[in-house]
Structure formats: structure tokens, C-alpha cells
């Protein structure tokens, strides 16, 4: 507590000195930060395999400092989600969540499309041919499979680091489950999104029906997409709020996604990860509950040294990239 009081006093003294300095007339302060060359950095950094991430269905690279790039890596199968994928995604994002050096993540698909969704041929033995003949036991078995598959995308949402989905080509079925668990979605002009499950005789059960209404805020449109399995093209996805930006092609989109990840990773990890936690809490709770939650959260987070470092950089017109924040 004493350390927090000392930090608060130092921050107050710093602000007082800056506010009364001659180059800040009228006791006003601007927190405008100069732009960062994230775009150049994103496109100019050679990719390297990330240590401790070796998978069959995924490729994980260190795109740049503090940024990991996770690729769905079954291009010959249109990145279809086989049994190995469902296990490896959980393993991958559990590691990322614990990786103190990682501050932002980009997810994309290798090859010609983001993903064709569930690999039904690979998973047929588990889903369509359960063992036994007792209805209750078969039901419990299938429920266990469903909840494990749900966790594959829950770990993305629960990951404290912001996750950016970069979609090109088709994003079908399970792909929509995946991207709606991400924090930010970019897409290329050739992208389309399809809630495909109704065409194969089932209801989507690993996240789309729960997250998509919250993402786009239009229940009528969600119902239309889920009942018909029609394609939502890139421009409609932008207009509905499913994605925040559309780019001419995959290459430009990936550069932009990595640039955004670099910009996010230049900020205080305490601030960014606290923001993600509170945004997710606020999505599922009332305004009053969420205000109480963030007050309890920030009663400790306001004591971070990152606050003083960020304010000092702003008052000196320095880029946050020049500030060294400790790992989190």
C-alpha cells in the first residue's frame, strides 16, 4: 500500500510540473501520441517459428516483438478442423495466455481460405458413431465432446492478450465460432462468412449462436444467417459490425492486422489486458455491475508503474514504443 501511495504522489508531482510548464499554457494537457511505424514493422519483420509451439494443424510464428501469429495450417484440406486441431488450439492458447512476452495475437489461415469448418470425415467416428446403445450414456458422451469443443474457442476469449482474426476466402461453420471469440476481426475483400451448420442437420453448438448476436447486435440478421446458411460477404460483414475493416487482398490485410497487433503491444500490458477483462465482463453484466467491477479492479491496477511511464511519455511527446514496460 505504501508503494502505491508513493507512486501516486510521484504521478501527481509529475503532472503538476508538466501542467505548469511554459509549453503547456492554460493548465491543459494533450495526451495525443504520435503515430507509430507499425505498418512498416509488420511487413518488414521476418517470421520465425515460436519456441514451445510445435503442432500438426497450426503454425505459430513470432511475427515481431511481443506479437504471435497463429495460422490454421492445413491448406490442402482448406484448414478444416480435425480432431487434432480441437486439441491443439486449447494447448496453443493456454501457452499464449501464460506467455509473459506475448502481448497480442493474430489468427489467420494458410492457403486459399480461412477455414472450411469442421472436418466431418475425420470426426465422424466420434460424433456420428458413438459407442454403446444406452441413450443416457451416449448422451453424456456426446455432451462431453461438445463441451470440449466449446473450450477450443473459449480459450481464445479467455486469453488475456487481444486476439485479432484476419480472414480471407471462406470462413465457414466452425470458422464463425472461432472469429466471434476473437476481440477484433479484419477481412479481405474475397472473404465470406457462413453459419453452415443448419445445412448439415444440426444447430451450431460451439459459440456462434451465443456470440454472434452480441457481436453484431442485430438478432434478425443473426436469425436469417443461422436459419438459411447463406453467405455474408465482406461488405455486409463490415456494415453489420462483424468486421471492423475490409482490405483489398490477403497480403494487405495481414500487414494491417500485424501492424495493429504491434500498436497494441506497444501499450502497457497492464492497461490492455485490464481493458479486455473489463470489456468482456461488461458485455455480460449490467452497467451498474460493470462499474462496480472496474472500480474494484482499478483500485489495484491504478498503482502500476505503467501509468506514470505512459503519462510521462505523453507529456514529453514520445511514442509509447520508446517506453519499456515490464512483462506481465
UniProtKB/Swiss-Prot annotation:
Is Membrane there in the keyword field? Answer: no
Where is the short sequence motif Microbody targeting signal located? 326-328
Looking at the record's lineage, which domain of life comes first? Answer: Eukaryota
- Please state where this protein is localized: Mitochondrion; Peroxisome
Site (Important for catalytic activity): which residue positions? 197, 205
Its pathway, per UniProt, is:
Lipid metabolism; fatty acid beta-oxidation
Q: Which UniProt keywords apply?
A: Acetylation, Fatty acid metabolism, Isomerase, Lipid metabolism, Mitochondrion, Peroxisome, Phosphoprotein, Transit peptide
Q: Which Pfam families match?
A: ECH_1
| Catalytic reaction(s) noted | (3E,5Z)-octadienoyl-CoA = (2E,4E)-octadienoyl-CoA; (3E,5Z,8Z,11Z,14Z)-eicosapentaenoyl-CoA = (2E,4E,8Z,11Z,14Z)-eicosapentaenoyl-CoA
The catalytic activity of this protein is classed by the Enzyme Commission as 5.3.3.-
Residues with the N6-succinyllysine modification: 231
What positions does the transit peptide occupy in this chain?
1-26
| Residues that coordinate or bind substrate | 116-120, 174
The record's GO molecular-function terms, alphabetically, read: delta(3,5)-delta(2,4)-dienoyl-CoA isomerase activity
Which Gene Ontology cellular-component terms appear in the entry? mitochondrion; peroxisome
UniProt xrefs under SUPFAM superfamilies: ClpP/crotonase
According to the UniProt record, list the residues that bear N6-acetyllysine: 327
InterPro entries referenced in this protein's UniProt entry, alphabetically: ClpP/crotonase-like_dom_sf, Ech1-like, Enoyl-CoA_hyd/isom_CS, Enoyl-CoA_hydra/iso, Enoyl-CoA_hydra_C
Top enzyme class, one word, equals: isomerase
Q: Which PANTHER family match?
A: DELTA(3,5)-DELTA(2,4)-DIENOYL-COA ISOMERASE, MITOCHONDRIAL, ENOYL-COA HYDRATASE
Its function, per the record, reads: Isomerization of 3-trans,5-cis-dienoyl-CoA to 2-trans,4-trans-dienoyl-CoA.
Q: Which family does it belong to?
A: Belongs to the enoyl-CoA hydratase/isomerase family.
Task: Note the subunit structure.
Answer: Homohexamer.
Q: What is this protein called?
A: Delta(3,5)-Delta(2,4)-dienoyl-CoA isomerase, mitochondrial
Q: What species does this protein belong to?
A: Pongo abelii (Sumatran orangutan)
Lineage, highest ranks first = Eukaryota, Metazoa, Chordata, Craniata, Vertebrata
Gene designation: ECH1
